Amino acid sequence: MGSLPSRRKSLPSPSLSSSVQGQGPVTMEAERSKATAVALGSFPAGGPAELSLRLGEPLTIVSEDGDWWTVLSEVSGREYNIPSVHVAKVSHGWLYEGLSREKAEELLLLPGNPGGAFLIRESQTRRGSYSLSVRLSRPASWDRIRHYRIHCLDNGWLYISPRLTFPSLQALVDHYSELADDICCLLKEPCVLQRAGPLPGKDIPLPVTVQRTPLNWKELDSSLLFSEAATGEESLLSEGLRESLSFYISLNDEAVSLDDA
């Protein structure tokens, strides 16, 4: 089983674990105290029609207290206390912790993500296992998301295709950013977080209202509604509604005639 090192120089990431960077983890309290995360869905706050967070919104984790975390929105600057299931941790832009396959697809299909946008997510059921998710653009059809399981050898090396192995996730990303060996397309850029735009529920258009007519339909002579003179802009009824009412009245008249017979 061969290995093919990437020609691209890896960016320094001192806080990455050994499986990501290929070396032992380095303790950095500053990095740990300011963890980056992303919202996994719209979360209500304040009222039924108000949404404080939206899918893909970047967050900073302030504190983790069991199932409830305190997060700071990088869009609004507001702080929220939300269930941890609504949040996924993100490190160096593309490695997600606590992200399901379905949510990965939702994030990658958000506006702003081009073909080749990608992320790597840690398995929620197999600790230490990872999957690569990539957005594939298709000009003649809808974009779709392709998923690739990243296998781990006994010596810690990783691979998608058995013929290519890598010492770390960073090396894997670097290689597939240059060559689309056995995957759908080149890895172009990490999944884009939604840093701009209105929050859901903030700029919802006002509902359409229908004013009550001042006419008293009980006292109105029906002959005025269907006369030739009542057509055009001065008509109380549209042409379509007039035809529907005429048909309804004719059905009622036929029913009355049958009853009388």
Swiss-Prot record:
Phenotype for residue 2 to A: Abolishes localization to membranes
Subunit structure of this chain's protein: Interacts (via SH2 domain) with ZAP70 (phosphorylated) and CD3Z (phosphorylated). Interacts (via SH2 domain) with CSF1R (phosphorylated). Interacts (via its C-terminal domain) with CBL (phosphorylated).
Keyword Phosphoprotein applies: yes
Residue segments, region Disordered: 1-31
UniProt name for this protein: Src-like-adapter 2
Main subcellular location of this protein, as a coarse class: cytoplasm
Location(s), subcellular: Cytoplasm
InterPro entries, A to Z: Grb2-like (IPR043539), SH2 (IPR000980), SH2_dom_sf (IPR036860), SH3-like_dom_sf (IPR036028), SH3_domain (IPR001452), SLAP_SH2 (IPR035052)
Domain free text: The loss of the C-terminal domain partially abolishes the inhibitory function, but can be partially compensated by higher level of protein expression.
Composition-biased stretches (Basic residues): 1-10
Pfam families referenced in this protein's UniProt entry, alphabetically: SH2 (PF00017), SH3_1 (PF00018)
Location of the region described as SLA C-terminal in the Swiss-Prot/TrEMBL record: 195-261
Tissue: Predominantly expressed in immune system, with highest levels in peripheral blood leukocytes. Expressed in spleen, thymus and lymph nodes. Expressed in T-cells as well as in monocytes, and at low level in B-cells. Also detected in placenta, prostate, skin, retina and colon.
GO cellular component term, pick one: cytosol
A GO biological process held by the record: negative regulation of T cell receptor signaling pathway
Molecular function via GO: signaling adaptor activity
PTM (free text): Phosphorylated by CSF1R.
Annotated SH2 domain residues: 94-191
Function: Adapter protein, which negatively regulates T-cell receptor (TCR) signaling. Inhibits T-cell antigen-receptor induced activation of nuclear factor of activated T-cells. May act by linking signaling proteins such as ZAP70 with CBL, leading to a CBL dependent degradation of signaling proteins.
Protein origin, superkingdom: Eukaryota
SMART domains xref list: SH2, SH3
Protein keywords: Cell membrane, Cytoplasm, Cytoplasmic vesicle, Lipoprotein, Membrane, Myristate, Phosphoprotein, SH2 domain, SH3 domain
Lipidation (N-myristoyl glycine): 2
Keyword set includes Cell membrane: yes
Coiled-coil intervals: none
Matches recorded under CDD domains: SH2_SLAP, SH3_SLAP2
